[in-house]
Structure formats: C-alpha cells, structure tokens
Curated annotation (Swiss-Prot):
One of its GO terms (molecular function) is phosphoprotein phosphatase activity. Residues 1237-1635 form the FH2 domain. Residues 1-194 form the Phosphatase tensin-type domain. Residues 648-662, 680-691, 701-711, 722-732, 743-752, 795-804, 821-832, 843-854, 865-874, 893-904, 944-960, 968-1213 have a biased composition (Pro residues). The keyword GTP-binding does not apply. Belongs to the formin-like family. Class-II subfamily. Residues 416-774, 787-1245 are annotated as: Disordered. PROSITE patterns: C2_TENSIN, FH2, PPASE_TENSIN. This is Formin-like protein 20. The lineage of its organism: Eukaryota, Viridiplantae, Streptophyta, Embryophyta, Tracheophyta. The active site is at 127 (phosphocysteine intermediate). It comes from Arabidopsis thaliana (Mouse-ear cress). PANTHER family: FORMIN-J, FORMIN-LIKE PROTEIN 15A-RELATED. SUPFAM superfamilies: (Phosphotyrosine protein) phosphatases II (SSF52799), C2 domain (Calcium/lipid-binding domain, CaLB) (SSF49562), Formin homology 2 domain (FH2 domain) (SSF101447). Residues 500-513, 585-597, 665-678, 809-820, 878-890 have a biased composition (Polar residues).
C-alpha cells in the first residue's frame, strides 16, 4: 500500500491519510468528535493550504458522505477554494452501504478523475459524523475497481484498520462487513458480465427459511418478524427506497419459536423486490413492542442465482457481541420466484390450537373453483347461484403461516368469520345471478407455492370476463351495463356491512389495534374477479376484526388486510388506465357515516345486518347482470398479505384516481337489466341490490378529488342542495331489511326527485316494455351519454362503453331499470355522469375537481332520475341513439350533437324509494334536441374549433354517490347545509349538453345558466307535452370554461318545475333549487346562492304531500320565479317557460357583450313570455321571438338542416364555431358561444368586477333567505344596465385599434426568418457584437489579413462560428427573401461568399500568431542550449563533483560501494540524507564547510549556471510538438495558396498577401528548425556528460537534479554560515565571561590586603 512509502516519497500534507496515489482521507473521519463550525473552517483551511503547496498545479475533487439531506458544511467551505464536492448518502436503510448504481457512479467518477491525462488530479475523501463505515467500504471498492488490490476481505480489513477498531463498533451496532463483502464481490465480478452495473432484476421475494434458530431473551427462543426495504418496483422514476414489507406486531402474526420445537421456520413474505434490497429479521420481545435485531442482509437482485440466496452465520450482519447466541449451523435461505411466475397451488394444512380444526384442500379443489368460474351457464331466468370462493384458513399458531384453499359451491352462503384465537375461517360466498355470460376465466392469477394468492399488485393479473367482443387490452376498465354488475362482488354480496356486523359479534379484536400498529403500509391487492374486499363493512369494527381473524403470521399492509377488487377486464391492471385499487373501509370512510346512516333509520336490525332471506331475495331479484357473477376473493393469510409500500397503491386520499368501472362482457351481456325490467312488465322491477355491493365498490375506491355537488343531490334526510366536498367516504351503510323485499306495484307516481324518508318502502312498477328494437336503440343512446372522450380534437370520439346512464349514486336496481340492452362494449371511454360513484372510474383523474353527478341524485342515491319511458318505434329511437352516442364526447373530440333525452332510470335507490313508471314516449320527444352537427355556422361544418386555451384533460366525473360512495361525504343531519362544491378550473374544453331525459313524473332540469364568459347555448328541446320534464343535465366538467349551458327546457304541464342545477363556481350560473322533498319529507333548505357573483338559485319546487320548501316554488298557475340574471360577461340563459296556465317569468336582463337568451317557449295555455329586454346584445343578434302558444318548440333554428324527427334547433350563439356541447350541459366556466352570430371572438366581461365577499349559502331566517324565498333576488333591478356598462366598463382596446396597432408593429419590426438553431444563432449574434464593423468590411479585412483591423481573439471567434456543411446546405436551399433572414443567417451567407472561408481564417490566425510563436520558440531553444553549454563548461561544478567523488569513496572505503570512478546524478540528493553521528550535520553541510575553508572560490559555482533554472521548466517534448506545429502550419499555408489560385477575383488580395507572408515564414522556419536540431543534440550531450543514458535520464531530469543540488548546497552553506556565527558569538561570550571571571579573581586579593 502507499502507506509504505518509498525512500524518496513525499510526505503527504498533515491531517490527511494517503490511501493510494493521489487519494487521501481527512483524518477527522477517524474520530467521533464533532468540531465546531469555526474550528472546522480552520481545520479545512489549513489542509487546503498544504494541498495547494504540495500539488501547486493539481485540481481537487472531494467525495463527501454526508449526514441527512441538508447541504454539507464541507461544501460551503471548500467551494470558496474552487474545489468540487460531490455528496453521497452515508447509508442505505441504516445499512452502511450504497445502492449498486450509486457505487458504480462513485467508482466511475473516481476512476475518470484520477486517470485524466496530463493532469495531476487529487481525490479527497470525507465523511460526516457516522459515515466512516460506508467510507471504508467505498475506499475498498475503489482499490478493487482500480485493481490496486486483490481479495475483497483482505482489502476491506486493511481499510478498516486505518481507523480505531472501536470507531466501527461505535458507529455501527451491527457488524456491516458481511454485506459489504457481498457488494465488494459484486464489484470484483463486474468483468464477468456484459453490462455492469446489471439491470435491476425484478423478483418475487417468496419467503425466508431459518434453520437452527438463535436464542434470545435468556434462551427463550426467537419470535422473528421481518422487514423488507427496497425501491418500489412500480415507481419507474423514483429510485428511493421504501418499506416494502413488514410483519404486524401482534400475537396472531408473531410466534415464539424454540429450537427444540422446530428444525426450521418458514416466514412468508410475498412481495416484489428489485435492485438493492435490505432484509431485516428482528426478534420481538414478549411485550410485542421491544425489538432486537437478529440479522440484516443487503443484496442486489441481479446477483441472485437460481432464485435462492443461501446465507451462513458469517454472511449476515449481526450484533457485535451475540455470535454465541447463533448456533454454528444457523442458516437463512431467502427464496424467490420469477417476477412473472405463477406459483402452483399446493396442498397446505393449517394447524391450530384446537385439534378439531384441521382443514385440508388440494389443487383439485381450487381448480374446481376455477372451473366454476369458467363455466357459468347463461340462465334464461338470469338466476344462477354459482358460489365458489377461495377460502383461506389460517391458524394463529401455525409456524409457517400457511393457508388452506377451499372451493365450494353453496347458494346463499354468507361470510362467516368465527374468531377464536385458533380458528379463523372465512367462507366468503356470493350468491350471484348471472346474465348471459360468454365465458369467465381466471387469467394468470399468481399463487404462492404454499397456495396463497400473490397479493402483490404486479403479480396479480385481473380475473376478468372473457368477452368475445371485448378488447383484451383496455385503456380503462369499462363500466358494466348493470348496476348489479357494478356491485363487484369480491367476497359474497352479503359480505358487506351486514355480515360484517354479524361477524363482529363473534370477534373480540379491537378496532384500533391494527390501525395504530402499521399505519404506513398500504393494502394488498387480492385475487378475484372484481372480488369484494373480505372486510369492508357498514361499521369499522367488524372490518378490522375480520382482518385480525385472518390468521397468524399476517403481514398486513394496512390494519385491515382486505382483499382488493380487480377490474374485470382481461388485461393486467397495468393495461388499465385508471385502475386505482381502492382503499379499504377503515381508511376510506369515517365511522361517523355509519352512525348517521343508522340515525337515518336505514337499518333496523341491531347491527345493521340484513336477514338472509331479505338479502337472497334482493340478490335474486336484482343481481342478474353479467357482472354479478361469482367473485373469488382470496383472503391472504397474515403472512401472505404483507404491507406493501405506500407507493404501491394510490394513497387513500381524496385525490386518488377513481376505480375502474366494471366492464361489459358481450352482446349477450349488453342486454341491460333495464331491458328485462322494461320488456317484461309482469315481474316487479328488480329492487336495488344489497348495499353491500355498492358499498364494496365505493369503499374500495380511492377517492378522487372532491367532486362538486350532484345536481340537486341531497343527503338522506336533508333537503340541502349541495353536499359538502366529500371526505374519504365511508362504506355504504347497510340497508334496511325491508329494502331487500320484492317491491310491490306502485301507487300513483310521485315526483322522482323527492327525497324520501328512509323508511318509505313503496316502489312503483316498471315502465311498460317497449318494442325490442326500440329498447335496443335506446340502449345505444344511454352509454354514449355516459362517456367522455379524451381524444384530441382531430380524433373521432371512440365508441363509449355502455355504462349505466342515469344511475348516479343509485344501487344496482337503478341500472337494472334504467339500462337497456346495448351492443357489445366498445373500448371504454370514461363513463360520464350517469355511472354510480363506485363504478365511475374511467375518466382519467386530473387534479381539477370532478363535475357534479348527473341528474340530481341524492348522496345516498335516494333521488334518482325518472324511469325510462317506453321507447318509441325503432327508427326514430335509433336515430336518436346515434345522436346520443356522439353527444358523449367532450369538445376535445369532434363535436357530437346534444343527445336526445335519454331514458332516466327508475328512482330505486333504496327499497323505500319510489320507482316511477315511465310514460309512453312519443317519437317526437325522443330526439327533440337538435344536433350540434347540424348547426353549421354560415354553412361551415360543425367540427369544433379548438378552444382558445388548450383544454386540460377533463377532470374525472363525479363519482356518483352510492350510499356513501368514496366521494360522497357522510350524510349530514336534517337541514345541515353542505359546503359549496370546489370551484372548477377556469379553462377547459366544452362538453356537449345532455338532453333532458323524458319522464313521466319529473320536471325537466333547467340546465345551469351561462357561466361568466360566453353566450348561452341553445336550450334543450322541450320534452313531450305531457309528463314532467326530465331532471336537469349535470353541469359540464369543472374545467369547462368555454361553453355556456343550454337554457332550461320548458317544464311540462302537470309536472313539478324542474330542479335547478347546482350553483356554478366563478361566475357560473346560479344554483338550481333543491329537488322538492317526497311525501312526508322535511322541506329542503334553500339552495345556496351561486358563487362569485352568480345570481341566487330559483327556489325549489314543491313536492307531493311534502312540506313546503323554504322558498315558495311556483305552483301550477303561478308565475315561475324569474330566471337568474346572467353572470357578468355572459349571455343570460333563456328563462324557463312558465307553468301551464301561469304567467311567464320575466326574462333576465342581458348583460353587456352576451347574446340575449331566447324567450322561454310558453306552455299549453300559458301566455307567451315577454321578450327579453334589449341589453348588451351583440350586433345583429335580435332576441328570438317567442314561439306561438300551445306547443313548446325550441328557439328558432339556425340555418341548416334540422335533425330528423328532432325539435327545432336552438338559435346559434354568438361567436361559436360549431363546437360540441357537453352532454351534461355547460354549467360552469366559460360558455360556448352559439354559432350563427358571426365569428367574432368570445367577449369577456366588459364590466369591472366588484370584489365583494360572496355569501354562498343563505342562512335560514337571513335577509338573503327571505329574498330567495320570495324570489326577489332575481327580479329585474331598477338599474340601467347600459349606464352601468358605460360607467364601469373595463378598459378594453377596440378590435380596430388592436388590428391597427398590430399593423403598425408589423411594419416597424418585420418578422425575421430563423433557419439556424436558435441557441447557435444567439451565440453567433453575441459574438458579432464584438466585431463592430459591417460584415462586408470584416470579410475584406480577413481576405487582406489586415492585423490592424481584427485581433486574434476575434479571428478565433469567427473560426468557431463558421457555418457547418449542414447549415450551408440549409441556407443554399432557402428560396425566400434573404433580407428577412436573421443576423446569424446573414453572417453565414457573407462567409459563404468566400470559398473555404474557414481555411482562410485559420491561415489568417496562423499569420497573426506566427511572429510571437517563433519568438517564444527561439527563446525556449536558446535557454536549453545555454543551460547545456553552461553546465558542460563550468569548471567549478567539475571541481565540486570531483570532491564529492573523493568524499564518497572515503566513506565507502573497504565496502562494495568504494573505489568508485563516478556516481549517478541522482546520488547528489543523498548528501543531504546522510547525517553525522551526532545528528548535528549532514554530508552536504560537511562538504560546504570544507569548501568554505579550503576552496571558497568554488562556493559561488551556481553563478555559472544562470540559465539552468529557466531551462528546467522547459519540456523537450513540448518543443518538439511546437516545432511540428510550425512546420505543419506552413504546409497548410502552401496548400491554401495553391487552392486559392482557382478561387477567382474574390481571393486575389488574399493570395498576394499570403504569398508574401509564406516567403518570409519559410526563412524563419528554416532557421528555427536548424536551431532546434542543435538544441536536441546538446541536450543529449548533457546526459552523456554525467555518464547517463539520454533515454533513461532525459534532459528534464538532469536539469531538475542539478537545480535541486544547487538549492540544497546553498541551503547547507547558509546554515553553516549561521552556525559559524552562532558559535563565534558563543565563543566571544564565553571569553568575556572568562575575562570577567579573571578580573574578579585578581580583585579579591587586593581587597583582602
């Protein structure tokens, strides 16, 4: 090692330890003391000063192993000295090692730094407190990497010995050397493989087997728990380490093992690892809190061979003093599986304390389950109980934590979780009636070798339905047509809160225990086709209990290791775009929701358990869709459901992506349940499925961003319009037992929007069945409206999936009644607003809050849309279907027409909700909504022009509240006003407006009024003249900012007024009144006023038999409330038509810059409404005349054809370009201008804003409440709008001025054409600023090689910025006006006029520097020549050498070294190293002393060698290179002279000047070349003069040695002189003392006498 230095080796600077050549370590690394800041700066400053003296021309790099993430102190200090400091961490998950990738970076950086040629780079190593162990490892790795040492253990021990042994013990409680040796072996093996470092090989860490257990706690045994750290295999970009797995510290998951009881212990892990992994085995004490490390290992997966890692006792990091606790035979075997391996299910047994509980299953039983999954037969009655589930039996004391797989087919089996500490059996069965299903297969499910399901997300592929017509790879998981399909039974349908409640009666485990123990881990994903979690319940307690009962060594990711549902598409979850695996009950919903639900009397049984028969009826009546098939939940045993890293699953936060929707299966499956309900009138409508299913789906969903409120959604017992932004929602509350009973035929239909009391149980009969074709056609329409397409504007809208359309938040029966048969599922665009919350997951989840749910669905899904009317004849309905399909796409795809009124589902959220029978629907009401496609703007096609601002991806639609779906907040108590929805982003693409669904008992929804900017969209077509109008379409996406909502459709006679839309944010339309409560319901509180200057919402309409809502709604014959005034800058929406026989409401005053709203069409018998007052209408946009009475046609159509069979299209909006409208209606953001009023830009608000603090909810009894109640807030004001516009107009430049100024600016500064890369062009222009002359003059100076005009730096810059061949070609091919080119292009063009301009510039540069170059070169040659002559001709030097030879022979007399005739030149330095016996003098001092006394004339011999010092700084090699450069340069001059002869007149001056220069230069070069030859010979002769070989002792070494001898000689002579003076002074002093002493002696006798 370099520590054993050679004799001449320089001593390193103080306080640095030299590890190898130019590699040093700060000595503070070997101490545990911590220096103060000032002391540390002084310490480093002293070292740096020494380094700079020691290595005057070197560069320094410091590698620092720092503590924590903050900037290191050494960086701050050394940056002042221009030293580079690279920081590395000092550990990896508490292990004093670094990831292999980081080690490789360190080694490569060090190697390249130290091996740079021509530079004496120095590497300094530093570590902060506690970093010595990793620094020692990295130094060892560097020595091995550079092959300076061999043998990993020897090298590591050698480096560790540089520090005190106690330091390593102090800094590392475990001996880190075994893992460090493992990584040193990785480094040593780097040449064996092709690539190093190898790629991170993904593996499945299966289990750990321990043989011959160690003793802990006084030889009691060992209670091992495991933790695994590593990088998240799913986070491709994030390389940081996380906790991948951890054992729960509970009695059921840990066990004390003793050597006498077991030979080996198998600890299951089952987690994915990749790259560097740290595995810790920890002994847990009896208190289950205290821990003691058993061992730790760090390894890299790329070096695992044959899927096993065998470790002896000496190959693990263990505590320093516990080796005696480990038997010599102790071994650990880490077993792996391939990343994609399917672990075969093997027979396993579970032992428990109770000997009677012994279960055994075989692979055959599991494959029986798989067979059942694969062979579900389509039953004509849509009822088949295929209950086959994998049951995991785990015993709490099973040492290996194994599981039992059990498959059985048992109808009406409920989740049974008997929990005593020994037996935990979960029989999870779901009774599922399946619709026609093609094939159900278990696809690529991974099972562990002991039969456990691989609970890691990567390893579990979806158990999906094998659709013949369904695409295998889905970007998103499709929504099932049937709400029962969305029920996603993962465990039994009854395995919801109800059974969990019953289970909780048997379980005694407390809820808080699992939560507090390992909160940071996430849930594991269980295998199952949309399997329900094993424990997601109505109450928290049963859920956690059920998890606790899952067996002993469970490594549960969250306190509740609940199965996660797998999307039902065939592809892996990786292929689904937004398969967010939902959080479980405990993490997703507060317990308060359960309480509030029970308070709302949703459940009557004590524990909220639904009786078996009720559930069975419920299931059989309702669950008959393809999706409600057997799901196979696999409840991992504790060991098989370990913690995953929090990053492995989306966190259960409100911003998680919604879960995927269930996918449709096939054409047979597309026959929605509504078709069954509609087509067969005799059977009662399928009641809603158990809340279990809905709950499971929603409770698992990671909550997306808080959605805005549903349209007129209400809490279960509250009439308030807007629910609060949801917290992580609770699981759905258990339904009342009577909710499962078959619903009786209905009484007269009440209004569908009424919020019923929870206990009301009457349900209306299903609508009359339409003809098959018409039903099929309507099914096409329904799915289309529910999806949004995120394709770019140029791409067509993909066919939407057939998800439930209006089943917003409703239970499965909503879809059953509302969904009609539909064709096989297309690739699934995200469902739009009609999918239940739990099934609505297809929209990509961008951060903006999702739009409100579709049609005023209550949070608890009580109020739903009216039932679908009987479909019209096939042709008409089919036509409307395609309109509907196109209407689903957002404006980012080609604009679909507004969809015709789709069929709204029955309002069957609960058994107690009313199901309204649909009225027969005439054809004209099916597609009354005009299609945007046929609203051309002056003949232009209706393809939507892209929005002015790029629309962000639409936010996910609101999850539709399904009981307490993930996004829905817990229902508040009666009358508690919910908080307003979050404001939508300001820009977005306009979604098409949805058509109002025609229904019998529900008024049409007034779409939200126009938002702050833009004109109102065309109003939706009027629904049929009888029956209540349909509910309002939902507002557009929250980020839609360019489309105004369609005006509210006219209400039908006999129907209650439509519920108004929710209040939009930021200048959006005013909120709608809440839906009227149902009979006996409490009156809802008044709706909150709109946000940001929006007008207050109209009062809610009254309900049948219900209490009057706070604001008096307009009744029949009464004048409806006036529409809210439009927001600033936006055109007002058309006012809603008056009620039958009622006076029309006055239209709102239009605001400046917006088109006036069309007047509302009068209803039958109603007076025509007054025309809107003239306001700030755009030019040429007169208000449309009111339509004639008697019918309710839409506003006048724009030019262009009308849709076949549809109502008249609405008037076009101002400035629209045929953009599509969102199916939900544009409720917020900037409105979409109507086509037809010219293509003027959309006008922004022309008024100054009033920055007030807005009240969003009118408190009951307040002034605003009274104004709302009496409708006064929406009456036309006395203020003159035109005067307001004049006084308070915003300063906006007129378009004419803008265009004029633009023209001026264009004329003043024309556009420059840029052909060259912008960065290069900028750099070129910067360079040209230093050449302050026109380009032609510059080129003339170059050709004349005029050194007075340009300097050498400018010429070098011109050479650097010469055009390349590619740039020349680019400019040559440019055919445009060259005067418009940029300055860089002009410069290049000027250079291109001269042939070979770069060569000419180099000639000029050579000429410029030639004189100086020759002068300096001659000076160097003369210095060398003079030095050689001086040394050889110096007689004094020769005499001194002769005396040294004599002196040496005298000393070496009689030895082999004696009798020398001469000595080598480097022996001169030995004179200073040879000391006298008294150590007071060296041989050099003696020589100088003798010469000074005997031959003082020789002492000034250095004066004869004056040129020696300057010559010693010259390298003959550099002289040779310079000579070669001069000769080559002259050759190039001649070549260019020859070539320029053919250039023509452009090079005449250049050629003449160059010829003259070459003649002079050749003479100079010949002289210098001759001198160079002489100098070379003299340098060689100098080595010969001292008897040296010039090849071994070159001129440079000779001069350096002589110069060093002169320095030492002078120094010794000076010291001799000083010593002589001291001795002389000392002698004088002694003489004086003697003299004084003698004087005293002579005086004494005189005194005596």
């Amino acid at each position: 090692m370099a520590l054993f230095r050679r004799f001449f080796y320089k001593k390193p600077p103080d306080r640095l330890l030299e590890i190898s050549e130019r590699v040093y370590v700060f000595d503070c690394c070997f101490s545990s003391d911590v220096m103060g800041e000032d002391e540390y700066k002084v310490y480093l400053g002293g070292i740096v000063a020494q380094l700079q003296d020691h290595f005057p021309e070197a560069s320094f790099m410091v590698f620092n192993f720092r503590e924590g993430e903050q900037r290191s102190q050494i960086s701050d200090v050394l940056s002042q000295y221009d030293m580079t400091v690279m920081d590395y961490p000092r550990q990896y998950e508490s292990c004093p090692l670094l990831p292999l990738e980081m080690i490789h970076h360190f080694l490569r950086s060090s190697e390249s730094w130290l091996s740079l040629e021509g530079q004496q780079n120095v590497l300094l190593m530093h570590c902060e407190r506690g970093g010595w162990p990793v620094l020692a490892f990295m130094l060892s790795g560097l020595l091995l990497y550079r092959k300076q040492y061999h043998g990993e253990q020897k090298t590591l021990e050698m480096v560790h010995k540089q520090a005190p042994k106690e330091l390593l013990h102090l800094l590392s409680p475990l001996n880190p050397q075994p893992s460090q040796l493992r990584y040193l072996q990785y480094i040593s093996r780097r040449n064996l493989g092709s690539d190093w470092p190898p790629s991170d090989t993904p593996l499945l860490l299966d289990c750990l087997i321990l043989r011959d257990l160690p003793h802990f706690e006084g030889k009691k045994g060992c209670r091992p728990i495991l933790r695994v750290y590593g990088q998240d295999p799913k986070a491709r970009t994030n390389r940081s380490s996380i906790l991948l797995f951890s054992t729960l510290k509970t009695k059921k998951h840990t066990r004390l093992y003793q050597q006498e009881e077991c030979i080996l212990v198998k600890l299951d892990i089952q987690c994915r690892v990749q790259g560097d992994v740290v595995l810790e085995c920890i002994h847990l004490h009896d208190d289950l809190v205290s821990e003691e490390m058993v061992f730790r290992i760090m390894f890299h997966t790329a070096f695992v061979r044959a899927n096993i890692l065998m470790l002896q006792r000496d190959e693990m990091d263990i505590l320093w003093d516990v080796k005696d606790q480990f038997p010599k035979e102790f071994k650990a075997e880490v077993l792996f599986s391939g990343a994609d391996a399917v672990v075969p299910p093997i027979t396993t047994s579970t032992l428990s304390d109770d000997e009677n509980d012994f279960d055994m299953t075989s692979p055959e039983e599991f494959f029986e389950v798989e067979e059942i999954f694969s062979d579900v037969i389509d039953g004509p009655d849509h009822k088949r109980d295929s209950d086959s589930f994998v049951v995991v039996d785990t015993a709490s004391d099973d040492s290996e934590g194994k599981e039992v797989w059990k498959g059985d087919v048992e109808p009406n089996a409920f989740l049974d979780c008997a929990s005593d500490d020994s037996n935990h059996k979960h029989d999870m069965h779901a009774e599922t009636s399946t619709d026609p299903v093609k094939d159900i297969t278990v696809d690529d499910v991974q099972y562990r070798s002991d039969g456990k399901a691989d609970s890691n997300i990567d390893s579990v592929k979806d158990i999906g339905i094998d659709d013949g017509d369904e695409q295998r790879k889905r970007r998103t998981v499709e929504a099932k047509e049937n709400d029962s399909s969305t029920v996603q039974t993962q465990s039994k349908g009854d395995e919801e809160s109800n059974d969990l409640e019953s289970m909780s009666q048997k379980t005694n485990t407390s809820l808080n225990k699992p939560i507090s123990e390992k909160p940071q881990a996430t849930l594991r994903k269980q295998v199952g086709a949309n399997a329900k979690p094993a424990a997601a319940g109505d109450s928290l307690k049963p859920k956690s209990k059920q998890q606790e009962t899952q067996g002993p060594n469970v490594r549960m990711a969250k306190p509740n290791a609940v199965s996660r549902w797998i999307p039902s598409n065939k592809g892996s979850y990786k292929d689904s775009m937004h398969v967010a695996y939902p959080p479980t009950r405990i993490n997703s919903a507060p317990a308060s929701i359960t309480t509030s639900l029970k308070d709302g009397k949703r459940a009557t049984s004590p524990d909220g358990v639904i009786p078996k028969d009720a559930k069975t009826k419920y299931l059989r009546a309702s669950v008959s869709s393809p999706d409600m098939r057997s799901r196979a939940p696999i409840c991992s045993s504790p060991d098989s459901s370990p913690k995953e890293t929090p990053s492995s699953l989306p966190p259960a936060s409100p911003h998680q992506a919604p879960p995927p929707l269930p996918s449709l299966t096939s054409e047979a499956k597309t026959v929605l349940h509504s078709s069954q309900a509609v087509a067969s009138p005799p059977p009662p409508p399928p009641p809603p499925p158990l809340p279990t299913y809905s709950h499971y789906q929603t409770s698992q969903l990671p909550p997306p961003p808080p959605p805005p409120p549903p349209f007129s959604s209400e809490r279960p017992n509250s009439g308030t319009v807007l629910p609060p932004p949801p917290p992580p929602p609770p699981p759905f509350s258990s339904e009342r037992p009577n909710s499962g009973t078959v619903l009786p035929p209905p009484p007269p239909p009440p209004l569908p929007f009424s919020s019923e009391r929870p206990n009301s149980g009457t349900v209306l009969p299903p609508p009359p069945s339409p003809p098959w074709k018409s039903v099929y056609a309507s099914a096409l329409a329904i799915p289309a409206i529910c999806s949004t397409s995120q394709a770019p504007t140029s791409s067509p809208t993909p066919p939407p999936p057939p998800p439930a359309y209006y089943s917003v938040g409703q239970k499965s029966s909503d879809l059953q009644t509302s969904q009609l048969p539909s064709p096989p599922p297309p690739p699934p665009p995200p469902p739009f607003a009609s999918v239940r919350r739990n099934s609505e997951t297809l929209l990509p989840p961008p951060p903006p809050p999702p739009p409100p749910p579709f049609a005023s669905v209550r949070r608890n899904s009580e109020t739903l849309l009216p039932p679908p009317p009987p479909p019209p004849p096939w042709k008409s309905l089919y036509a409307s279907t395609f309109e509907t399909h196109e209407a689903c796409s957002t404006s980012s795809s080609p604009p679909p027409p507004p969809p015709p009124p789709p069929f709204s589902p029955l309002n069957t959220t609960k058994a107690n909700d009313y199901i309204l029978p649909p009225p027969p629907l005439p054809y004209t009401s099916i597609a009354p909504s005009p299609s945007v496609k046929i609203l051309p703007l002056h003949g232009i096609s209706s393809a939507p022009s892209p929005p002015v601002k790029t629309a962000p991806p639409p936010p996910p639609p609101p999850p539709f509240s399904n009981a307490h779906s993930v996004l829905s907040p817990p229902p508040p108590s009666y009358g508690s006003p919910p908080p307003p929805p979050p404001p939508p982003p300001s820009y977005g693409s306009p979604p098409p407006p949805p058509p109002p669904p025609p229904s019998y008992g529900s008024p049409p929804p007034p779409p939200p009024p126009p938002p702050g900017y833009g004109s109102p969209p065309p109003p939706p077509p009027p629904p049929p003249s009888y029956g209540s109008p349909p509910p309002p379409p939902p507002p557009p996406f929250s980020h839609v900012s360019s489309i105004p909502p369609p005006p509210p459709p006219p209400p039908m006679h006999g129907g209650a007024p439509p519920p108004p839309p929710p209040p939009p944010m930021h200048g959006g339309a005013p909120p709608p009144p809440p839906p009227p409560p149902m009979h006996g319901g409490a009156p809802p509180p008044p709706p909150p006023p709109p946000m940001h200057g929006g007008a207050p919402p109209p009062p809610p309409p009254p309900m049948f038999g219900g209490a009057q809502p706070p604001p008096p709604p307009p009744m029949r014959g009464g004048a409806p409330p006036p529409p809210p005034p439009p927001m600033r800058g936006g055109a007002p929406p058309p006012p809603p038509p008056p009620m039958r026989g009622g006076a029309p409401p006055p239209p709102p005053p239009p605001m400046h810059g917006g088109a006036p709203p069309p007047p509302p069409p009068p209803m039958r018998g109603g007076a025509p409404p007054p025309p809107p007052p003239p306001g700030g209408r755009g030019p040429g946009a007169p208000p449309p005349p009111p339509p004639p009475g008697g019918r309710a046609p839409g506003p006048p159509p724009p030019p262009g054809p009308r849709p076949p069979g549809g109502g008249p299209p609405p008037p076009p909006m101002l400035g629209a370009r045929g953009a599509a409208v969102d199916p939900r209606g544009a409720g917020r953001g900037r409105g979409l201008p109507r086509p037809g009023f010219g293509s003027a830009a959309q006008k922004k608000s022309s008024l100054k804003p009033l920055h007030w603090v807005k009240v969003t909810r009118a408190l009951q009894g307040s002034l605003w409440d009274e104004l709302q109640r009496h409708g006064e807030s929406q009456t036309p004001s006395e203020f003159d709008v035109s005067e307001i516009e004049t006084l308070f107009s915003a300063t906006v430049q007129k378009p004419a001025d803008k265009s004029g100024s633009r023209r001026k600016s264009v004329g003043a500064k024309p556009e420059k054409v840029q052909l060259i890369d912008l960065r290069r062009a900028n750099n070129t222009e910067i360079m040209l600023t230093k050449v302050k002359m026109p380009l032609p003059d510059m080129m003339a100076a170059v050709l004349a090689m005029d050194e007075s005009v340009l300097d050498v730096d400018q010429i070098e810059n011109l050479i650097k910025f010469c055009p390349t061949k590619e740039e020349m070609e680019l400019l040559k091919n440019y055919t445009g006006d060259k005067t418009t080119l940029g300055k860089c292009e002009q410069y290049f063009l000027e250079l291109m006029k001269v042939p070979r301009v770069e060569a000419k510039l180099r000639v000029f540069s050579f000429k410029f520097q030639f004189g100086t170059q020759i002068t300096e070169f001659k000076k160097s040659l003369n210095a060398v020549n003079s030095a050689c002559e001086e040394v050889r001709s110096s007689q004094k030097l020769k005499e001194i050498m002769k005396k040294i030879l004599y002196l040496g022979n005298t000393l070496n007399q009689g030895t082999a070294r004696g009798a020398a005739v001469g000595f080598k030149l480097d022996s001169l330095s030995k004179l200073s190293d040879t000391r006298a016996a008294n150590s007071k003098m060296t041989l050099m001092h003696y020589l100088c002393k003798v010469l000074a006394s005997k031959a003082s004339v020789l002492l000034d011999f250095p004066k004869d060698l004056e040129s020696l010092e300057s010559a010693s700084k010259i390298q003959l090699k550099s002289l040779a290179e310079e000579m070669q450069a001069i000769i080559k340069g002259l050759e190039k001059l001649n070549q260019e002279l020859t070539a320029s002869e053919s250039d023509g007149p452009v090079s005449d001056v250049f050629r003449k000047t160059l010829g003259d220069f070459i003649s002079v230069a050749e003479t100079e070069v010949a002289t210098v070349s001759s001198l160079y030859s002489v100098v070379g010979r003299n340098a060689d002769a100098l080595a010969h003069y001292f008897g040296e070989d010039p090849n071994r002792c070159p001129f440079e070494q000779v001069t350096a040695t002589l110069l060093n001898f002169i320095r030492l000689f002078k120094k010794a002579h000076e010291e001799n002189v000083k010593q002589a003076e001291l001795e002389k002074k000392k002698a004088l002093k002694e003489a004086e003392m003697e003299k004084a002493k003698g004087v005293n002696l002579t005086k004494k006798p005189v005194d005596d006498s």
